[in-house]
Protein backbone atom coordinates (compact mmCIF):
# COMPACT_ATOMS: atom_id res chain seq x y z
CA UNK A 1 0.00 0.00 0.00
CA UNK A 2 1.39 3.42 -0.93
CA UNK A 3 1.47 6.40 1.40
CA UNK A 4 -1.27 8.11 -0.61
CA UNK A 5 -3.50 5.05 -0.29
CA UNK A 6 -2.97 4.83 3.46
CA UNK A 7 -4.02 8.47 4.02
CA UNK A 8 -7.25 8.12 2.01
CA UNK A 9 -10.47 7.94 3.98
CA UNK A 10 -13.16 5.55 2.84
CA UNK A 11 -16.85 5.40 3.69
CA UNK A 12 -19.71 3.07 2.96
CA UNK A 13 -23.05 4.82 2.64
CA UNK A 14 -26.15 2.68 3.03
CA UNK A 15 -29.37 4.37 1.94
CA UNK A 16 -32.96 3.27 2.47
CA UNK A 17 -35.35 5.21 0.25
CA UNK A 18 -39.14 5.15 0.40
CA UNK A 19 -40.70 4.48 -3.00
CA UNK A 20 -42.22 7.97 -3.05
CA UNK A 21 -38.74 9.49 -2.49
CA UNK A 22 -36.78 7.71 -5.21
CA UNK A 23 -37.09 10.51 -7.78
CA UNK A 24 -35.95 13.21 -5.32
CA UNK A 25 -33.09 11.05 -4.04
CA UNK A 26 -31.82 10.43 -7.57
CA UNK A 27 -32.06 14.14 -8.37
CA UNK A 28 -30.00 14.85 -5.26
CA UNK A 29 -27.38 12.29 -6.23
CA UNK A 30 -27.26 13.63 -9.79
CA UNK A 31 -26.46 17.06 -8.35
CA UNK A 32 -23.91 16.13 -5.67
CA UNK A 33 -21.95 13.14 -6.97
CA UNK A 34 -20.31 15.17 -9.78
CA UNK A 35 -18.83 17.43 -7.07
CA UNK A 36 -16.69 14.63 -5.60
CA UNK A 37 -13.58 15.21 -7.79
CA UNK A 38 -13.47 18.88 -6.75
CA UNK A 39 -12.73 17.63 -3.23
CA UNK A 40 -10.36 14.79 -4.13
CA UNK A 41 -13.25 12.39 -3.72
CA UNK A 42 -14.04 9.30 -5.74
CA UNK A 43 -17.14 7.16 -6.05
CA UNK A 44 -15.56 3.71 -5.92
CA UNK A 45 -18.77 1.74 -6.30
CA UNK A 46 -22.51 2.42 -6.41
CA UNK A 47 -25.01 -0.39 -6.05
CA UNK A 48 -28.81 -0.34 -6.16
CA UNK A 49 -31.44 -3.01 -5.58
CA UNK A 50 -34.03 -3.87 -8.25
CA UNK A 51 -36.80 -1.58 -7.02
CA UNK A 52 -34.52 1.38 -6.26
CA UNK A 53 -35.32 1.55 -2.55
CA UNK A 54 -31.80 0.63 -1.39
CA UNK A 55 -28.43 1.96 -2.46
CA UNK A 56 -24.90 1.41 -1.26
CA UNK A 57 -22.02 3.68 -2.16
CA UNK A 58 -18.33 3.23 -1.46
CA UNK A 59 -16.63 6.62 -1.57
CA UNK A 60 -13.12 7.72 -0.75
CA UNK A 61 -11.36 11.04 -0.26
CA UNK A 62 -7.67 11.94 -0.20
CA UNK A 63 -8.05 13.13 3.40
CA UNK A 64 -10.61 13.71 6.11
CA UNK A 65 -10.27 17.45 5.45
CA UNK A 66 -11.33 16.88 1.84
CA UNK A 67 -14.34 14.90 3.06
CA UNK A 68 -15.33 17.67 5.49
CA UNK A 69 -14.94 20.29 2.75
CA UNK A 70 -17.21 18.23 0.49
CA UNK A 71 -19.83 17.88 3.23
CA UNK A 72 -19.80 21.63 3.88
CA UNK A 73 -19.66 22.76 0.25
CA UNK A 74 -22.44 25.25 -0.55
CA UNK A 75 -22.87 23.59 -3.96
CA UNK A 76 -23.74 20.35 -2.17
CA UNK A 77 -25.76 21.79 0.69
CA UNK A 78 -27.88 23.81 -1.76
CA UNK A 79 -29.43 20.50 -2.82
CA UNK A 80 -30.06 19.17 0.70
CA UNK A 81 -33.76 19.93 0.34
CA UNK A 82 -34.00 17.15 -2.27
CA UNK A 83 -32.47 14.68 0.16
CA UNK A 84 -34.80 15.83 2.93
CA UNK A 85 -37.85 15.62 0.67
CA UNK A 86 -36.88 12.09 -0.36
CA UNK A 87 -37.17 10.96 3.30
CA UNK A 88 -34.18 8.68 2.67
CA UNK A 89 -32.50 7.19 5.74
CA UNK A 90 -28.71 7.25 5.50
CA UNK A 91 -26.07 5.34 7.40
CA UNK A 92 -22.48 6.50 6.85
CA UNK A 93 -19.78 4.08 8.00
CA UNK A 94 -16.07 4.94 8.06
CA UNK A 95 -14.11 1.96 6.79
CA UNK A 96 -10.50 0.79 6.68
CA UNK A 97 -8.90 -1.03 3.77
CA UNK A 98 -7.67 -4.39 5.04
CA UNK A 99 -6.17 -5.76 1.84
What are these regions (language model features)?
Residues 88-90:
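Short, mixed-charge low-complexity intrinsically disordered segments
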Residues 67-68, 74-86:
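C-terminal structural segments of small proteins and small subunits
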Residues 1-72, 93-99:
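Short S/T/G/P-rich N-terminal loop/turn motif that feeds into the first structured element of a domain
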